Amino acid sequence: MKKFINVYIKSDYDIVILRLSVIIIFMLFGTYKWFDFEVMALKPLISPTWLNILYIMFGVHGGSYFLGIVETITFLALSIGFFRPAAGILGDIIVIVTGLVTLSLLPQLGKVDSFVIKDVLLLGVGSVLLKYDLKNHLNIKN
């Protein structure tokens, strides 16, 4: 057990698992944005908020597609980040911005639910991945 713990402590397994988790989340939710069930699920959440500007600019479906494109860019950048830290940095920043944008809806929604509160985790995850990718990109050792 001690050997396993030492191997784990010296490895990047935690970051790999964290990155894969976020990739899966953004891949799933980014893909969902192209389907009517998600378009309709987002409508009551987005309509009363400042994000309604997406509906004004692109329509209800177009607003959902826009979010899908952003989430697709995010998971692709995070995936490429395994090999190119600069791409990972882009993905990490979008993860953080996504969390901030979604959390900014709280005052207008007037309630806390799982749609919004999960984004607290995105701030933390994005920050951890950003630090890791910046260190790799700048060749900074611990």
What is the role of each PLM region?
Residues 1-73, 77-142:
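Membrane-interface extramembranous regions
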